[in-house]
């Protein structure tokens, strides 16, 4: 999967899936390539750990968590995002998405 912090990759992914941001959900996705690895590192997550993420968006932080934790469970309320996450997280068998509010 190409880098999820590349604006061109993000734009193409969102357009392909017909996704537009929801103001009602207050959606803002992290795209700074240096932030997510630092967040995952600061959380101290490593082998033997699990991670629970609320609001994975397109999976930028999720990807970093999956690289470190044994299991990652992400909870998403936007019913439009699972197809995007299925694509962006396809390489990670330690990822599980829960669609719930």
Regions of interest found by a model, annotated:
Residues 1-101:
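Catalytic cores of RNA-modifying enzymes
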């Amino acid at each position: 999967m190409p880098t999820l912090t590349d604006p061109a990759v993000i734009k193409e992914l969102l357009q392909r899936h017909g996704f537009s941001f929801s103001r009602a959900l207050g959606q803002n996705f992290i795209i700074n390539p240096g932030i997510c690895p630092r967040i995952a590192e600061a959380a101290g997550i490593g082998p033997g750990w699990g991670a629970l993420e609320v609001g994975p968006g397109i999976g930028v932080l999720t990807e970093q968590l999956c690289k470190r934790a044994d299991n990652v469970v992400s909870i998403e309320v936007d019913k439009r995002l699972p197809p995007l996450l299925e694509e962006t997280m396809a390489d990670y068998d330690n990822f599980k998405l829960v669609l719930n509010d």
